[in-house]
Amino acid sequence: MKIAYYTIRFHTPAFLGSAEQGGQWRAPPFKAQLRQWWRMVFAATHDFKPDVRVMRREEGRLFGHAWLGDDVDECGAPVPARKSLVRMRLGEWASGQMTSWTASKHRVSHPEVRQAVASDLYMGFGPLLLPSGSNNPVLKSGAAIQAGESTRYSLAYPEEHSQMIETALALMNRFGTVGGRSRNGWGSFT
């Protein structure tokens, strides 16, 4: 088992929700990111034409599953579920400290909206709201994890999977985003 230690730092605010819908550092979004980038690495090693069944089987054996109907153990006995061989831990699951939002000075117009609104409202629609009668967006509820916050990230994984895991981690470092509105650049981290 190989163990690696990293520091994760957000470059843009992140909306990672706890059960109470407040911003909180949580490991599951980062594990989901690792799985997603692992799929990209798997596809790349198969000339971007992988057999999806083979990919899902390999993913399930590495990251755990409850869906593979054809999985067997070392003795050939059927395995209905398998736990992950990848272990992950965040240094802390602290709540976000960002409790207010400074609205952008830039305004945009849209044919379906009567007045020009702050441009960040479009990028953050959902986590950001526009209160009735206001021109400036506010955070919906709870706190967000603000840009610049960081925590320690520990990862343990089988040595034989190190090349693909480390390539996936490199892709996460370059392109990773997590949380609400991450497709719009929120939750960008290295």
Where do the model's predicted regions map?
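Small/polar/charged residue-enriched interaction surfaces, especially the RNA/DNA-contacting tracks
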Residues: 1-190
